[in-house]
Amino acid sequence: MLNDLYEEIKLRKTQPREGSYTNYLFDKGLDKILKKVGEEATEVVIAAKNNEQELIAEVSDLTYHLLVLLAEQNIPLSKIQAELQNREGKLSTTRDRKEINDL
């Protein structure tokens, strides 16, 4: 499903459709896309304190905007998948992850 959505987003970049929100983001450029990613990430944090449906909706929005960002930067989704697979099964401790203790 994410692959299909990513492919559709990439298609909008090369074959714009009038009135498309995705094309609006591409037309406005990287700064607008980054602003939306930041807004949606904040909304995820807030939604996590509320209810499940709101969290699902906000995570979906964030995921979409992250895919737009990847397409804007010409980063294939396969590189993200490869990075996640590379991390699978790796052990780390809180000592290895300084940022955990800083929260």
From Swiss-Prot:
It catalyses: 1-(5-phospho-beta-D-ribosyl)-ATP + H2O = 1-(5-phospho-beta-D-ribosyl)-5'-AMP + diphosphate + H(+). GO terms for cellular component: cytoplasm. GO terms for molecular function: ATP binding; phosphoribosyl-ATP diphosphatase activity. Belongs to the PRA-PH family. InterPro entries: HisE, PRib-ATP_PPHydrolase-like. Pfam families: PRA-PH. It is found in: Cytoplasm. Pathway: Amino-acid biosynthesis; L-histidine biosynthesis; L-histidine from 5-phospho-alpha-D-ribose 1-diphosphate: step 2/9. The gene is hisE. It comes from the Bacteria. Its EC number is 3.6.1.31. GO terms for biological process: L-histidine biosynthetic process. This is Phosphoribosyl-ATP pyrophosphatase. HAMAP family: HisE (MF_01020). The keyword Kinase does not apply.
